[in-house]
């Protein structure tokens, strides 16, 4: 009897899936993908970690700290980098933008000076030090900021300020000094006269020649009835107090101020005489007499008295010269009149309670240009 040997059923070969086949063909691919995913997880983990906090100092202060820490008080750019990295953890990280900030502050700020490199020193890199003129900014650890060019602008403006003060544009509040209760007004001889100021404004004229032929100042006070006529003249060369001694006549009662363009004498002796005649001078203006028929009548006359107290028979017709507004001369209306008021104090403020009148230089001028 033959024994049947039962063989175990042969197991079918395991069917390989397409993924497994791909895995067999590309054996290294799973490891590469796993490394990429691990790197992504690492980045996400590092993103949650904050970098060290920035030092509570400006870059100017940090650079000054680095330079002052050196015995020679000078450092190269790389040495400044090393000092900051060794001192503050913020500069040890992956962020490198702070180096640009250090370079910009060194080159753009005026308190840092780049020293020339010596001939015996090879390699590149200049030494940087602190400007001696700016050391006061960093005394006792005070790192105060200053705008770039602050001191240079101030030094550049100093000559202009001194020139403006030398011209005496602020002479109006300085030349008038009210002394006590008498109301005395003083006129210093060294004050800037009006003609010199106009000559400076003209620019093209020499200092000894007035642009419009003005060499003095005159103001005529005419009352409404023509009974009293006061005319005062004051030049920059005379420096006394000029007073009117008649305490009975009111100066400002219904008076009309009529400024005239005059050529006054440079020196004056003030006398209270009422019979002193007018002194006529030749005009200094280079006007053509033939082209301007009014030049002869417009040649002004100066009065060397402080105030002339005339009687009632001395009317305004006796005054030589043409008023500013004259009805009989139509050509005067065609001419343009330029009035320069360099004095803010009118003659109305010169009235004192005791009846003694002190008159000072009044700068109302009529500049009548020549009609060519």
UniProtKB/Swiss-Prot annotation:
GO MF annotation: an example: DNA-binding transcription factor activity
InterPro entries named among the record's database cross-references: Fork_head_dom, Forkhead_box_regulator, TF_fork_head_CS_1, TF_fork_head_CS_2, WH-like_DNA-bd_sf, WH_DNA-bd_sf
Cell compartments where the protein resides: Nucleus
Conditions for induction: By bmp4, probably acting indirectly via t/bra. Also induced to a lower extent by fgf and activin.
Lineage summary: Eukaryota, Metazoa, Chordata, Craniata, Vertebrata
Function: Probable transcription factor. Required for smooth muscle (visceral mesoderm) differentiation during gut development. Also required for normal proliferation of the lateral plate mesoderm. Acts as a downstream mediator of bmp4-signaling.
A Gene Ontology biological process term: BMP signaling pathway
UniProt DNA-binding residue ranges: 54-148
Name listed for the protein in its UniProt record: Forkhead box protein F1-B
Pfam families hit by this protein: Forkhead
